[in-house]
Curated annotation (Swiss-Prot):
Ranges where the record places region Disordered: 217-242
Organism for this UniProt entry: Homo sapiens (Human)
Designated gene of the protein: EMC7
Gene Ontology cellular-component annotations: EMC complex; endoplasmic reticulum membrane; membrane
Keyword set, alphabetical order: Endoplasmic reticulum, Membrane, Signal, Transmembrane, Transmembrane helix
Protein's UniProt name: Endoplasmic reticulum membrane protein complex subunit 7
Length: 242
């Protein structure tokens, strides 16, 4: 009977070993079916780059700056040399921007494939189909300080002179004063044309007639000239009589 027991013991040992081997192979097969070839949906990647402000040391502004990926879905911080790394990002398309209260940076779109390939391009909200490639890792350069306020305009004499109300009052006055001196008013045809043109402009009947004003203006000058001429002729005639 002891010999029978010793003969049954190796068979029992083989059965136990075969059961352990099968149980260890089943989890491996399940893991292989869900994970694929090692790069699957659950894999995460990182976005790298560097932010630069021309003429300013990184230590002067990086403490208040942040790196935002798709708003605040992923947040990164800048190192002392201006470089940054944002971890744990799945494949997809993301807008990466450096946010700083003192400097402005243009956003960049980064496309990550399922195999981990990176492609960076400008963000164009107007022409979305236009693609302008950028080097990767990202090199984000500041375009200057942001303009939070509009500069207040200073008052000048040109603003006063170019006011429409001032121009409406000054220009007619200049025309009435300078035009008789420039144009030959002794010509009756020229005077008649000027009166007709001014009457065409004077569409409001409540205002005084411009032609009457021009006639009085020119007639006063002509009468003054004639009176001065007659006085001169009278004096010359009196001299001759003497």
């Amino acid at each position: 009977m002891a010999a029978a027991l010793w003969g049954f013991f190796p068979v029992l040992l083989l059965l136990l070993l075969s059961g352990d081997v099968q149980s260890s192979e089943v989890p491996g097969a399940a893991a292989e079916g869900s994970g694929g070839s090692g790069v699957g949906i659950g894999d995460r990647f990182k976005i790298e780059g560097r932010a630069v402000v021309p003429g300013v040391k990184p230590q002067d502004w990086i403490s208040a700056a942040r790196v935002l990926v798709d708003g605040e879905e992923h947040v990164g911080f800048l190192k002392t040399d201006g470089s940054f790394v944002v971890h744990d990002i799945p494949s997809g398309s993301y807008v990466v921007e450096v946010v700083s209260p003192a400097y402005r940076f243009d956003p960049v779109r980064v496309d990550i494939t399922s195999k981990g390939k990176m492609r960076a391009r400008y963000v164009n909200y107007i022409k979305t189909s236009e693609v302008v490639r950028l080097p990767y890792p990202l090199q984000m350069k500041s375009s200057g300080p942001p303009s939070y306020f509009i500069k207040r305009e200073s008052w000048g004499w040109t603003d006063f002179l170019m006011n429409p109300m001032v121009m409406m009052m000054v220009l007619p006055l200049l025309i009435f004063v300078l035009l008789p001196k420039v144009v030959n008013t002794s010509d009756p045809d020229m005077r008649r044309e000027m009166e007709q043109s001014m009457n065409m402009l004077n569409s409001n009947h409540e205002l005084p007639d411009v032609s009457e004003f021009m006639t009085r203006l020119f007639s006063s000058k002509s009468s003054g000239k004639s009176s001065s001429g007659s006085s001169k002729t009278g004096k010359s005639g009196a001299g001759k009589r003497r």
